[in-house]
Amino acid sequence: MDDSTPYPVPQELYIPQKMKAFMAEPQGCALVAALEGQFQCSIVVINDHLSVISSADGVAVDINQIEKILRDVWRKRDVQIMIREAALNASCTHICHTLLPRAYCAVVLFFSSDLQRRSRCTDIIIDQFTGKVTMFGTEQAVNKAREMMIECLTEHFGLLEMNIPPTQRTTRMGYTNSYNPEIRTHLPPNSFLNSVFPMGEPNAILTSTPPTTSIMDEPLLSASLEKHLLFPSDFSVPPPRLSPVQELPLTPPKTCVVEKIKQWIPTTEVGKILGNRAAVKKHIERQFNCVITVHTEVQSSFGATPVEIVAQNKEQCQEARNAVMSLMQSHQDKPASNPPDSGFSTPGSPFTSDSSSTTPEKRGNSRQYHRGSFRDQPKVMLALTPRKLSPSD
Protein backbone atom coordinates (compact mmCIF):
# COMPACT_ATOMS: atom_id res chain seq x y z
CA MET A 1 0.00 0.00 0.00
CA ASP A 2 1.42 3.37 -1.02
CA ASP A 3 1.52 5.88 1.88
CA SER A 4 3.04 8.75 -0.14
CA THR A 5 1.20 12.07 0.19
CA PRO A 6 0.09 13.81 -3.02
CA TYR A 7 2.09 16.82 -4.12
CA PRO A 8 0.12 20.08 -3.60
CA VAL A 9 -1.30 21.55 -6.77
CA PRO A 10 -0.04 25.12 -7.38
CA GLN A 11 -2.53 27.91 -7.87
CA GLU A 12 -1.82 30.33 -10.72
CA LEU A 13 -3.08 33.83 -11.41
CA TYR A 14 -2.22 36.32 -14.15
CA ILE A 15 -0.37 39.50 -13.10
CA PRO A 16 0.60 42.51 -15.26
CA GLN A 17 4.18 43.20 -16.28
CA LYS A 18 4.49 46.32 -14.12
CA MET A 19 3.41 44.42 -11.03
CA LYS A 20 5.90 41.70 -11.91
CA ALA A 21 8.66 44.34 -12.07
CA PHE A 22 7.56 45.65 -8.65
CA MET A 23 7.93 42.16 -7.15
CA ALA A 24 11.52 42.05 -8.46
CA GLU A 25 12.45 45.28 -6.64
CA PRO A 26 13.84 45.20 -3.07
CA GLN A 27 10.55 46.40 -1.58
CA GLY A 28 8.58 43.78 -3.53
CA CYS A 29 10.99 40.98 -2.58
CA ALA A 30 10.65 41.88 1.09
CA LEU A 31 6.85 41.87 0.76
CA VAL A 32 6.88 38.44 -0.94
CA ALA A 33 9.10 37.02 1.82
CA ALA A 34 6.73 38.39 4.48
CA LEU A 35 3.69 36.89 2.74
CA GLU A 36 5.39 33.50 2.43
CA GLY A 37 6.04 33.47 6.17
CA GLN A 38 2.53 34.62 7.02
CA PHE A 39 0.59 32.22 4.76
CA GLN A 40 3.07 29.28 4.98
CA CYS A 41 3.40 29.03 1.22
CA SER A 42 5.83 29.46 -1.65
CA ILE A 43 5.27 32.34 -4.08
CA VAL A 44 6.86 32.06 -7.53
CA VAL A 45 6.44 34.15 -10.69
CA ILE A 46 6.45 32.03 -13.86
CA ASN A 47 6.28 34.10 -17.05
CA ASP A 48 3.17 36.25 -16.54
CA HIS A 49 1.53 34.13 -13.82
CA LEU A 50 1.74 34.22 -10.04
CA SER A 51 2.10 30.67 -8.72
CA VAL A 52 1.36 29.89 -5.05
CA ILE A 53 2.09 26.49 -3.47
CA SER A 54 1.10 25.67 0.12
CA SER A 55 3.93 24.48 2.36
CA ALA A 56 1.65 22.95 5.04
CA ASP A 57 -0.14 19.69 4.32
CA GLY A 58 -3.87 19.96 3.94
CA VAL A 59 -3.93 23.76 4.28
CA ALA A 60 -5.36 25.69 1.36
CA VAL A 61 -3.99 29.12 0.51
CA ASP A 62 -6.17 31.87 -0.90
CA ILE A 63 -4.23 33.18 -3.89
CA ASN A 64 -6.73 35.98 -4.44
CA GLN A 65 -5.98 37.42 -1.00
CA ILE A 66 -2.23 37.31 -1.65
CA GLU A 67 -2.70 38.94 -5.04
CA LYS A 68 -4.89 41.66 -3.49
CA ILE A 69 -2.23 42.47 -0.87
CA LEU A 70 0.49 42.65 -3.53
CA ARG A 71 -1.63 44.86 -5.78
CA ASP A 72 -2.59 47.24 -2.95
CA VAL A 73 1.01 47.72 -1.85
CA TRP A 74 2.09 48.18 -5.45
CA ARG A 75 -0.50 50.91 -6.08
CA LYS A 76 0.30 52.66 -2.80
CA ARG A 77 3.98 52.58 -3.75
CA ASP A 78 3.21 54.32 -7.05
CA VAL A 79 1.20 57.00 -5.24
CA GLN A 80 4.03 57.50 -2.75
CA ILE A 81 6.51 57.92 -5.60
CA MET A 82 4.26 60.53 -7.24
CA ILE A 83 3.96 62.47 -3.98
CA ARG A 84 7.71 62.15 -3.45
CA GLU A 85 8.47 63.48 -6.94
CA ALA A 86 6.09 66.41 -6.47
CA ALA A 87 7.67 67.32 -3.13
CA LEU A 88 11.21 67.11 -4.55
CA ASN A 89 10.18 69.08 -7.63
CA ALA A 90 9.00 71.90 -5.36
CA SER A 91 11.86 71.79 -2.85
CA CYS A 92 14.90 71.25 -5.14
CA THR A 93 16.25 73.67 -7.72
CA HIS A 94 17.48 71.30 -10.46
CA ILE A 95 16.52 67.93 -11.92
CA CYS A 96 18.02 65.43 -14.38
CA HIS A 97 15.49 63.11 -16.03
CA THR A 98 16.55 60.31 -18.39
CA LEU A 99 15.23 57.02 -19.81
CA LEU A 100 17.62 54.05 -19.82
CA PRO A 101 17.41 50.41 -20.90
CA ARG A 102 16.49 47.98 -18.15
CA ALA A 103 20.01 46.59 -17.88
CA TYR A 104 21.44 50.11 -17.52
CA CYS A 105 18.70 50.99 -15.02
CA ALA A 106 19.57 47.92 -12.92
CA VAL A 107 23.22 49.03 -12.69
CA VAL A 108 22.17 52.54 -11.65
CA LEU A 109 19.82 51.07 -9.04
CA PHE A 110 22.66 48.94 -7.65
CA PHE A 111 24.97 51.96 -7.28
CA SER A 112 22.25 54.52 -6.45
CA SER A 113 23.18 54.85 -2.77
CA ASP A 114 26.84 55.35 -3.66
CA LEU A 115 25.96 57.92 -6.34
CA GLN A 116 23.75 59.82 -3.93
CA ARG A 117 26.36 59.78 -1.18
CA ARG A 118 29.29 60.88 -3.34
CA SER A 119 27.43 63.54 -5.33
CA ARG A 120 25.41 64.79 -2.31
CA CYS A 121 22.25 65.09 -4.38
CA THR A 122 18.95 65.19 -2.54
CA ASP A 123 17.37 62.00 -3.92
CA ILE A 124 17.41 59.58 -6.86
CA ILE A 125 14.12 57.98 -7.97
CA ILE A 126 14.42 54.91 -10.22
CA ASP A 127 11.61 53.03 -11.98
CA GLN A 128 12.95 49.72 -13.28
CA PHE A 129 9.89 48.93 -15.40
CA THR A 130 10.04 52.07 -17.53
CA GLY A 131 13.78 52.69 -17.05
CA LYS A 132 13.16 56.21 -15.76
CA VAL A 133 15.93 57.69 -13.61
CA THR A 134 15.33 61.07 -11.97
CA MET A 135 17.90 62.93 -9.86
CA PHE A 136 17.01 65.91 -7.66
CA GLY A 137 19.20 68.46 -5.87
CA THR A 138 21.24 71.57 -6.47
CA GLU A 139 22.79 72.30 -9.86
CA GLN A 140 26.29 71.27 -8.78
CA ALA A 141 25.10 68.08 -7.06
CA VAL A 142 22.89 66.95 -9.95
CA ASN A 143 25.66 67.60 -12.50
CA LYS A 144 28.07 65.60 -10.36
CA ALA A 145 25.59 62.71 -10.06
CA ARG A 146 24.99 62.79 -13.83
CA GLU A 147 28.72 62.58 -14.61
CA MET A 148 29.21 59.75 -12.11
CA MET A 149 26.27 57.84 -13.61
CA ILE A 150 27.75 58.19 -17.11
CA GLU A 151 31.16 56.97 -15.89
CA CYS A 152 29.54 54.03 -14.07
CA LEU A 153 27.57 52.96 -17.14
CA THR A 154 30.65 53.37 -19.35
CA GLU A 155 32.69 51.17 -17.03
CA HIS A 156 30.09 48.37 -17.28
CA PHE A 157 28.82 48.61 -20.87
CA GLY A 158 31.58 50.45 -22.75
CA LEU A 159 31.05 53.58 -24.82
CA LEU A 160 27.47 54.86 -24.53
CA GLU A 161 25.54 55.20 -27.78
CA MET A 162 22.95 57.48 -26.20
CA ASN A 163 22.98 61.05 -24.90
CA ILE A 164 22.06 61.71 -21.29
CA PRO A 165 19.87 64.87 -21.12
CA PRO A 166 21.45 67.85 -19.35
CA THR A 167 20.34 69.22 -15.99
CA GLN A 168 17.17 71.31 -15.98
CA ARG A 169 15.49 73.65 -13.52
CA THR A 170 12.52 72.55 -11.46
CA THR A 171 9.28 74.44 -10.80
CA ARG A 172 10.75 75.87 -7.61
CA MET A 173 12.74 78.40 -9.65
CA GLY A 174 9.45 80.06 -10.63
CA TYR A 175 8.49 80.87 -7.04
CA THR A 176 10.73 83.76 -6.10
CA ASN A 177 8.48 85.35 -3.47
CA SER A 178 7.67 83.26 -0.42
CA TYR A 179 4.86 83.99 2.00
CA ASN A 180 5.83 86.25 4.88
CA PRO A 181 3.29 86.32 7.74
CA GLU A 182 4.72 89.58 9.08
CA ILE A 183 3.64 91.49 5.96
CA ARG A 184 -0.08 92.15 6.12
CA THR A 185 -2.24 92.93 3.13
CA HIS A 186 -3.94 96.32 3.03
CA LEU A 187 -7.67 95.67 3.37
CA PRO A 188 -10.42 98.21 4.04
CA PRO A 189 -11.26 98.58 7.73
CA ASN A 190 -14.21 96.76 9.19
CA SER A 191 -15.97 100.04 9.91
CA PHE A 192 -16.07 100.80 6.20
CA LEU A 193 -17.52 97.37 5.40
CA ASN A 194 -20.09 97.73 8.16
CA SER A 195 -21.14 101.13 6.91
CA VAL A 196 -21.47 99.95 3.32
CA PHE A 197 -23.09 96.58 4.03
CA PRO A 198 -25.14 96.89 7.26
CA MET A 199 -26.16 93.53 8.64
CA GLY A 200 -28.33 94.63 11.55
CA GLU A 201 -29.00 91.97 14.16
CA PRO A 202 -27.20 88.62 13.93
CA ASN A 203 -30.48 86.73 13.59
CA ALA A 204 -32.20 89.34 11.45
CA ILE A 205 -32.66 86.90 8.61
CA LEU A 206 -34.50 84.51 10.92
CA THR A 207 -36.76 87.10 12.53
CA SER A 208 -39.35 89.38 11.08
CA THR A 209 -37.66 92.46 12.55
CA PRO A 210 -35.97 94.37 9.72
CA PRO A 211 -32.48 95.83 10.27
CA THR A 212 -32.10 99.33 11.60
CA THR A 213 -30.95 100.80 8.26
CA SER A 214 -32.89 98.83 5.74
CA ILE A 215 -33.11 101.62 3.20
CA MET A 216 -30.03 101.66 0.93
CA ASP A 217 -28.83 105.09 -0.08
CA GLU A 218 -27.40 104.43 -3.55
CA PRO A 219 -25.60 107.77 -4.02
CA LEU A 220 -23.97 107.44 -0.61
CA LEU A 221 -23.03 103.83 -1.28
CA SER A 222 -21.47 104.62 -4.68
CA ALA A 223 -19.56 107.57 -3.20
CA SER A 224 -18.17 105.35 -0.43
CA LEU A 225 -17.07 102.73 -2.91
CA GLU A 226 -15.57 105.42 -5.17
CA LYS A 227 -13.10 106.44 -2.47
CA HIS A 228 -11.71 102.92 -2.09
CA LEU A 229 -11.42 102.06 -5.78
CA LEU A 230 -8.13 102.35 -7.63
CA PHE A 231 -9.75 103.61 -10.85
CA PRO A 232 -12.92 105.69 -11.21
CA SER A 233 -16.10 103.86 -12.05
CA ASP A 234 -16.54 105.78 -15.31
CA PHE A 235 -15.76 102.99 -17.77
CA SER A 236 -15.92 105.31 -20.77
CA VAL A 237 -12.43 106.52 -19.88
CA PRO A 238 -9.77 103.81 -20.18
CA PRO A 239 -7.58 103.27 -17.15
CA PRO A 240 -4.13 104.87 -17.19
CA ARG A 241 -1.27 102.79 -18.50
CA LEU A 242 1.21 101.72 -15.90
CA SER A 243 4.89 101.14 -16.55
CA PRO A 244 5.69 97.47 -17.11
CA VAL A 245 7.17 95.67 -14.17
CA GLN A 246 10.79 94.81 -14.73
CA GLU A 247 11.34 91.18 -13.83
CA LEU A 248 14.60 90.52 -12.11
CA PRO A 249 16.64 87.59 -13.42
CA LEU A 250 16.35 84.47 -11.34
CA THR A 251 20.09 83.80 -11.49
CA PRO A 252 22.96 86.22 -12.02
CA PRO A 253 24.28 86.27 -15.58
CA LYS A 254 27.18 83.96 -16.22
CA THR A 255 30.45 85.68 -16.96
CA CYS A 256 32.19 82.55 -18.25
CA VAL A 257 30.09 80.18 -20.35
CA VAL A 258 31.82 76.98 -21.41
CA GLU A 259 30.69 73.69 -22.87
CA LYS A 260 32.31 70.37 -22.06
CA ILE A 261 32.26 67.02 -23.87
CA LYS A 262 33.87 63.79 -22.70
CA GLN A 263 34.90 61.21 -25.30
CA TRP A 264 36.52 57.81 -24.76
CA ILE A 265 39.32 56.64 -27.07
CA PRO A 266 41.30 53.38 -27.05
CA THR A 267 44.25 53.48 -24.68
CA THR A 268 46.52 52.13 -27.41
CA GLU A 269 45.75 55.21 -29.54
CA VAL A 270 46.66 57.80 -26.89
CA GLY A 271 50.12 58.16 -28.38
CA LYS A 272 48.57 59.43 -31.62
CA ILE A 273 47.41 62.56 -29.81
CA LEU A 274 50.19 63.00 -27.26
CA GLY A 275 53.03 61.90 -29.56
CA ASN A 276 55.64 64.36 -30.85
CA ARG A 277 55.12 66.66 -27.86
CA ALA A 278 51.33 66.68 -28.36
CA ALA A 279 51.61 68.51 -31.68
CA VAL A 280 48.31 67.15 -33.01
CA LYS A 281 46.49 68.11 -29.82
CA LYS A 282 47.86 71.66 -29.99
CA HIS A 283 46.90 71.90 -33.65
CA ILE A 284 43.29 70.91 -32.91
CA GLU A 285 43.15 73.32 -29.96
CA ARG A 286 44.32 76.23 -32.14
CA GLN A 287 41.98 75.32 -34.97
CA PHE A 288 38.78 75.00 -32.92
CA ASN A 289 39.66 77.33 -30.01
CA CYS A 290 39.26 74.66 -27.35
CA VAL A 291 41.18 72.88 -24.60
CA ILE A 292 41.73 69.11 -24.84
CA THR A 293 42.70 67.11 -21.75
CA VAL A 294 43.65 63.44 -22.00
CA HIS A 295 43.06 61.82 -18.60
CA THR A 296 45.78 59.19 -18.66
CA GLU A 297 45.54 58.86 -14.89
CA VAL A 298 42.14 57.13 -15.18
CA GLN A 299 42.55 53.36 -15.01
CA SER A 300 39.84 51.79 -17.16
CA SER A 301 39.01 48.10 -17.20
CA PHE A 302 37.91 47.96 -20.85
CA GLY A 303 40.96 49.62 -22.46
CA ALA A 304 39.70 53.15 -23.03
CA THR A 305 40.96 56.56 -21.89
CA PRO A 306 38.70 59.60 -21.40
CA VAL A 307 39.37 62.75 -23.43
CA GLU A 308 37.76 65.96 -22.16
CA ILE A 309 37.09 68.81 -24.62
CA VAL A 310 36.19 72.27 -23.27
CA ALA A 311 35.13 75.08 -25.62
CA GLN A 312 32.95 78.17 -25.70
CA ASN A 313 29.99 76.53 -27.45
CA LYS A 314 28.70 73.12 -28.45
CA GLU A 315 29.65 73.54 -32.11
CA GLN A 316 33.33 73.91 -31.28
CA CYS A 317 33.17 70.90 -28.96
CA GLN A 318 31.49 68.77 -31.62
CA GLU A 319 33.99 69.82 -34.32
CA ALA A 320 36.96 69.13 -32.04
CA ARG A 321 35.54 65.72 -31.12
CA ASN A 322 34.96 64.91 -34.79
CA ALA A 323 38.57 65.86 -35.53
CA VAL A 324 39.84 63.57 -32.77
CA MET A 325 37.64 60.69 -33.91
CA SER A 326 38.65 61.17 -37.56
CA LEU A 327 42.27 61.07 -36.45
CA MET A 328 41.65 57.80 -34.62
CA GLN A 329 39.78 56.38 -37.62
CA SER A 330 42.50 57.38 -40.08
CA HIS A 331 45.13 55.56 -38.04
CA GLN A 332 42.92 52.51 -37.59
CA ASP A 333 42.40 52.24 -41.36
CA LYS A 334 46.17 52.11 -42.05
CA PRO A 335 47.79 48.70 -42.71
CA ALA A 336 49.74 47.16 -39.87
CA SER A 337 52.92 46.64 -41.98
CA ASN A 338 54.01 50.29 -41.69
CA PRO A 339 52.87 51.61 -38.29
CA PRO A 340 53.69 55.29 -37.62
CA ASP A 341 55.49 56.35 -34.49
CA SER A 342 53.36 59.45 -33.80
CA GLY A 343 50.18 61.02 -35.02
CA PHE A 344 51.85 64.21 -36.23
CA SER A 345 54.67 62.88 -38.43
CA THR A 346 52.44 60.54 -40.44
CA PRO A 347 52.12 61.52 -44.14
CA GLY A 348 48.45 60.52 -44.15
CA SER A 349 47.56 62.68 -41.17
CA PRO A 350 44.80 65.20 -42.02
CA PHE A 351 46.48 67.97 -40.03
CA THR A 352 50.14 67.90 -41.13
CA SER A 353 52.39 67.99 -44.17
CA ASP A 354 54.90 65.38 -45.30
CA SER A 355 58.04 67.00 -43.88
CA SER A 356 56.82 68.33 -40.56
CA SER A 357 58.86 66.37 -38.02
CA THR A 358 62.04 65.62 -39.99
CA THR A 359 65.16 67.69 -39.49
CA PRO A 360 66.74 69.52 -42.48
CA GLU A 361 69.73 67.17 -42.64
CA LYS A 362 67.46 64.12 -42.68
CA ARG A 363 64.94 65.24 -45.30
CA GLY A 364 67.01 64.17 -48.26
CA ASN A 365 67.53 60.67 -46.90
CA SER A 366 65.11 58.01 -48.14
CA ARG A 367 65.34 56.08 -44.85
CA GLN A 368 62.53 56.97 -42.43
CA TYR A 369 63.82 58.94 -39.48
CA HIS A 370 63.03 57.59 -36.00
CA ARG A 371 63.54 59.92 -33.07
CA GLY A 372 64.12 57.05 -30.66
CA SER A 373 66.74 55.23 -32.75
CA PHE A 374 70.06 54.46 -31.04
CA ARG A 375 72.17 55.24 -34.11
CA ASP A 376 70.76 58.76 -34.38
CA GLN A 377 72.03 59.76 -30.93
CA PRO A 378 75.00 62.18 -30.80
CA LYS A 379 78.42 60.55 -30.82
CA VAL A 380 79.33 62.49 -27.67
CA MET A 381 76.92 60.35 -25.69
CA LEU A 382 78.64 57.24 -26.99
CA ALA A 383 82.05 58.55 -25.97
CA LEU A 384 80.90 59.31 -22.42
CA THR A 385 79.44 55.85 -21.95
CA PRO A 386 81.64 53.83 -19.53
CA ARG A 387 83.21 50.73 -20.97
CA LYS A 388 82.24 47.35 -19.68
CA LEU A 389 85.11 45.45 -18.07
CA SER A 390 85.50 41.79 -18.83
CA PRO A 391 85.40 39.37 -15.89
CA SER A 392 88.98 38.28 -16.61
CA ASP A 393 90.31 41.78 -15.85
UniProtKB/Swiss-Prot annotation:
One of its GO terms (molecular function) is mRNA 3'-UTR binding. Its main location: cytoplasm. SUPFAM superfamilies: Eukaryotic type KH-domain (KH-domain type I) (SSF54791). Expressed throughout the germline and in oocytes (at protein level). Residues 345-359 have a biased composition (Low complexity). It is found in: Cytoplasm, Perinuclear region. Residues 328-393 are annotated as: Disordered. Transmembrane segments: none annotated. Disruption phenotype: RNAi-mediated knockdown results in increased apoptosis and increased sensitivity to DNA damage-induced apoptosis in response to ionizing radiation in the germline. SMART domains: KH. Residues 12-76 are annotated as: KH 1-like. Keywords: Cytoplasm, RNA-binding. Residues 79-157 are annotated as: KH 2-like. Signal peptide: none annotated. GO terms for cellular component: cytoplasm; nucleus; perinuclear region of cytoplasm. Residues 259-322 are annotated as: KH 3-like. GO terms for biological process: mRNA splicing, via spliceosome; negative regulation of apoptotic process; negative regulation of gene expression, epigenetic; regulation of alternative mRNA splicing, via spliceosome. RNA-binding protein which binds to its own mRNA and target mRNAs to negatively regulate gene expression to modulate apoptosis and differentiation in the germline. Negatively regulates the expression of the argonaute protein wago-4, and may thus play a role in RNA-mediated gene silencing (RNAi) in the germline. May interact with wago-4. The KH-like 3 domain is required for binding to RNA. This is Messenger RNA-binding inhibitor of apoptosis 1. The lineage of its organism: Eukaryota, Metazoa, Ecdysozoa, Nematoda, Chromadorea. The gene is mina-1.
